[in-house]
Amino acid sequence: MIQDTIADMLTRIRNANAMRIYTVCMPMTSVAREIAVILETEGWIDSWKEASVNSLILRLKYRGAKQQPILTGLRRVSRSGCRVYVSAKEVPKVLGGMGTAIISTSKGIMTDREARNHRLGGEVICLIW
């Protein structure tokens, strides 16, 4: 059984990205589905779909003839052993705004830009660049 489903999701994406694999299958949770929606709307992945009740399939994006990955880095920030919370003023900017931070707020899971616009802080789930 997987203890940290978000870390497992990010690791599967990171490994598939390194091997230039287009589709990634993973166990589906409500948080994983919301992260997949954010990744798609921000342009980090091509698409996602629910394959069955318990699985989620992501289609990764690559660019150019050499199939360079769009995602160059994923990092889990808040872990089960060490939670990281930030106030609305301390919401991180990833690479000066070129990347995305995913924040779990009282209004749901959102990007760093949305959290700043709504003036919300919360738990920093991961950083994507």
Swiss-Prot record:
Protein name: Small ribosomal subunit protein uS8c
NCBIfam families: PRK00136.1 (NF001109)
SUPFAM superfamilies: Ribosomal protein S8
Entry's family note: Belongs to the universal ribosomal protein uS8 family.
Principal location class: plastid
Keyword tags: Chloroplast, Plastid, Ribonucleoprotein, Ribosomal protein, RNA-binding, rRNA-binding
Cellular compartments per GO CC: chloroplast; ribonucleoprotein complex; ribosome
Compartments reported by the entry: Plastid, Chloroplast
Pfam families in alphabetical order: Ribosomal_S8 (PF00410)
GO molecular function: rRNA binding; structural constituent of ribosome
PANTHER family referenced in this protein's UniProt entry, alphabetically: 40S RIBOSOMAL PROTEIN S15A
InterPro entries named among the record's database cross-references: Ribosomal_uS8, Ribosomal_uS8_CS, Ribosomal_uS8_sf
Domain of life: Eukaryota
Function as written in the Swiss-Prot or TrEMBL entry: One of the primary rRNA binding proteins, it binds directly to 16S rRNA central domain where it helps coordinate assembly of the platform of the 30S subunit.
Description of how the protein assembles with itself and partners: Part of the 30S ribosomal subunit.
Biological processes per GO annotation: translation
